Structures are given as C-alpha cells and as structure tokens.
C-alpha cells in the first residue's frame, strides 16, 4: 500500500489527539504548544534521577505517527519512558518554541524534532549535542542524504528520523515514457500540451520555500553544489549550473510551458490542476498519489492515466530531488542525555519504529524499509531518496532561502536582470555560513 496522507504538505490538520495504539504505555501524554509546561515539567528539569523519562518536542503535524513511535518505545522501555510535547504544525512556530526554551535555558525538552534544514543553526548556537560517535550506527542503515542533513561541517549533531522526496508525475495517455532529461521533458511536454490543449507543467512556483526547492532541484540536476564539502565557502557560481537552472525556468515561463499562474502556485494548486487533467507533467511530493488515483475518495480525471517517475537531470544520468523530513537531536540542556541519545538512535534504526512512519504516510529514513516493500512506487521513492540532495543545514539557511526567493523569483519572471540576481545569491550563500 502506498502513502495515504490526510493532507498535502501545506495543509492543516486537527490538533485533537488520536487514540494510542493498543497496548501502548499509558504514560504517553499528548499536549499542544502553548498549553502550559510539558509533561513531567511542573517542577522543572527534563527528568528525575529515580524515574528517568524524556520529553520529545516534535511537530504537531503527523501526530498519529509520532504517537505510535513513542508508544512503541514505551512498551519496550518501561523504565525509560518518553513523553511527547506536540509543537505547532507550522515550521516557524516550531522553531520559535524550541528557541524560546533553549534561549531561556528552561530545558524542558530533551529531544528536539528538527526540520532537516535547521541542523547547522542549532549546532552553531551550541543548542544540541554532538552525536558523531553514533555515526557508525546510522551510516549504511539510514539514507545517505538523510545523514547529510543531520550534520554540520562533517560532524553529526542529529540522527535521521523521517524523510521526503519528489516525484515527476506524467500523463500516460499523452507520454509514452518518462523523460530522462529536462530538455526532453520540455520538448515532449510542449508537444503533448499543444495537442491536448492543456498546460505543459505544474509545480511549486510561488515565492516561498517551494520555489527554492524547485530552483535547487534544477541547479543540482545541472551538477551544481551550493558549498564545498566542508561547508566553508560558497560554490554557487562555480560552473554554469546556477545560470542553467535559472535559464530553464525563465524559458519555461516565457514560452508558456509552465502553466498560467505557475508563479503563484503551491503544492495543492498543482495537484488540483493535474488531477483535473489540465497538465502533462507535475513536480510534487508523494502525498498526491492516492488523491490522483482515487484511492482517497476524491474524483480524478486522471485516475487511470498517470504514473510517477524520478525527476530528470540535464545530462540524463540519475535523478535529484530535494530532501524533506525531520531529524532528532539531543538538547544540551537535557538532564537525561543518555536516555535521549538512546531514543534518537532507536528511532533512526529500529525497523518497527521506521515501519510505523511508512504506515502513517511519512517516508522513513531507514533504507531496508523501502527494500522490503512490495509497492513499486514506494521502492522507487527509496531509490529517489538514495540520490536526493539535502538543502544545506547551514546556520543562515533561512536568510539564503529568502535571498533565492527575493532575487531569483523576479528574475525567472523577466522582471530582474539574472546576472546581478545570481551574484546576490552567491553573497547570501557566503553570509549563510557566518550568520550568528
């Protein structure tokens, strides 16, 4: 069975707790952000010496998955319980809540569920423990790209937990075989769109993080890297990948290959258009599969006429996708660091815990979960994630992301000179390494 998520990546989900799995330890408590102290914290301190327990601060989205993972740990570790503190579903609010706890030195959280792009920022501030000694436990077990997101300057400060990657959706009634190159995608999509009277391509083109991901996937597909291996300097303008990616987006917009309104389109806008039969190709996350196929109870004009494939590259070799997901880190303020370390390692490497993520529509980071699946699309996702790129978890990633949005979004629309725009991103990339 493939992913059957209850929402798209930008959707909203109820914050009411769902029942725990049968047999789960009763100790697990589910709280919402802003509802007072986390469980066990009324008297301060993240754990008691005679009753070691830890508090796991994690996103309120995908609540059922995290509940079940915590319940499984509690069943198998009755003397070292984990209690879950659910943060707000949105990334900005999550980050704010964790920073508030850390900057005030309240120390209410032992384990921090971090967006994959936050590792460098939290490590640079000294907020999370080094987990470098656990590297042998996850390398060869977790997806390589997921491990990359958990390190800053080649040192592990978190361990992989969940992931995400992109599919190329295409119309099987209009396209015989999925394209291997972006040029082939452009040419076949243009021809098929003209013949069918629809758009060639839909995806994430609004001025937000989705646009950054769309640009970076083209940039990486052209052979680019944002930083050197040690993350000490920007390599954004080395070679022609930066201009190749921007040129493709500019041409796709100018020629009408991108659907009308692409420059204000987010995930579910693209999904709705493709589901209505209004596009040849779509870049999107796996959540769209059951919606398009009708498995989620929605009407779909393409239920029998679409398939998924890896995103192409410019030279036709391999694939590249941006990685999403969460890593777990240990707070430097935790009073139960050893239990916290044990938990984050278990969550990364326990087959049962990782399988629970897949069952709840969250792509896991453990490679064997994909290899053992009978679902061809799920196995394909595993292959995609194995080659995926991590957005660099540098301290100033947020500022770099905003620079890409502010400079390259107008440039691809023909409203700004591409040369100075790319140079501005280069400066922002250098600044992102030094941001405090």
Please place each PLM-identified region on the residue numbering.
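Hinge/lid segment of periplasmic solute-binding proteins
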Residues: 116-165, 177, 184-186, 303-309, ...
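Conserved N-terminal structural module of periplasmic/extracytoplasmic solute-binding proteins
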Residues: 2-120, 300, 315, 355, ...
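Conserved C-terminal helix/tail region of periplasmic/extracytoplasmic solute-binding proteins
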Residues: 2-3, 384-436
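Extracytoplasmic/periplasmic substrate-recognition and gating elements
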Residues: 75, 251-257, 294-359
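Long, aromatic- and glycine/proline-rich binding clefts that accommodate carbohydrate-like moieties
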Residues: 306-310, 356-403, 410
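A structural signal for short loop-to-beta-strand junctions that line the ligand-binding cleft
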Residues: 99, 108-110, 138-173, 184, ...
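Glycine-centered hinge/linker elements that transmit conformational signals in sensory
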Residues: 188-189, 232-263
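Short, solvent-exposed loop/beta-turn-alpha elements that line the ligand-binding surface or hinge
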Residues: 133-142, 205-209, 224-244, 294-301, ...
């Amino acid at each position: 069975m493939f992913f059957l998520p209850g929402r798209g990546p930008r959707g909203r989900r109820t914050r009411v707790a769902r029942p725990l799995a049968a047999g789960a330890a009763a100790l697990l408590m589910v709280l919402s952000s802003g509802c007072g102290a986390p469980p066990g914290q009324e008297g301060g301190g993240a754990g008691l010496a005679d009753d070691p327990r830890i508090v796991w601060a994690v996103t309120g989205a995908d609540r059922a998955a995290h509940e079940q993972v915590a319940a499984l740990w509690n069943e198998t570790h009755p003397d070292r319980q984990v209690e879950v503190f659910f943060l707000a579903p949105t990334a900005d609010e999550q980050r704010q809540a964790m920073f508030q706890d850390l900057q005030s030195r309240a120390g209410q959280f032992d384990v921090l569920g971090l967006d994959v792009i936050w590792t460098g920022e939290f490590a640079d501030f000294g907020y999370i423990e080094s987990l470098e000694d656990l590297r042998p436990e996850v390398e060869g077990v977790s997806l390589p790209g997921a491990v990359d997101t958990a390190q800053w300057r080649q040192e592990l400060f978190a361990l992989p937990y969940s992931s995400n990657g992109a599919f190329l959706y295409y119309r099987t009634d209009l396209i015989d075989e999925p394209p291997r190159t972006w040029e082939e995608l452009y040419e076949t999509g243009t021809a098929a769109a003209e013949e069918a009277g629809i758009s060639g391509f839909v995806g994430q083109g609004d001025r937000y993080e989705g646009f950054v991901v769309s640009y970076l996937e083209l940039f990486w597909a052209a052979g680019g890297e944002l930083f050197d291996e040690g993350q000490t300097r920007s390599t954004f303008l080395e070679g022609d990948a930066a201009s190749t990616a921007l040129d493709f987006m500019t041409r796709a917009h100018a020629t009408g290959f991108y659907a009308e309104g692409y420059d204000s389109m987010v995930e579910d806008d693209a999904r709705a258009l493709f589901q209505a039969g209004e596009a040849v190709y779509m870049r999107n996350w796996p959540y769209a599969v059951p919606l398009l196929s009708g498995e989620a109870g929605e009407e779909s004009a393409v239920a029998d006429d679409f398939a998924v494939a890896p995103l192409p590259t410019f030279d036709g070799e391999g694939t590249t996708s941006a990685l999403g997901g969460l890593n777990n880190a240990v707070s430097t303020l935790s009073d139960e660091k050893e239990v916290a370390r044990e938990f984050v390692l278990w969550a990364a490497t326990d087959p049962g815990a990782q399988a629970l993520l897949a069952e709840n529509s969250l792509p896991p980071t453990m490679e064997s979960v994909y290899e053992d699946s009978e679902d061809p699309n799920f196995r394909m996702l595993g292959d995609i994630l194995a080659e995926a790129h991590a957005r660099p978890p540098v301290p100033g990633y947020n500022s770099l992301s905003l620079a890409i949005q502010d400079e390259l979004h107008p440039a691809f629309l023909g409203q700004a000179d591409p040369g100075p725009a790319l140079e501005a991103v280069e400066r922002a990339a250098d600044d992102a390494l030094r941001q405090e």
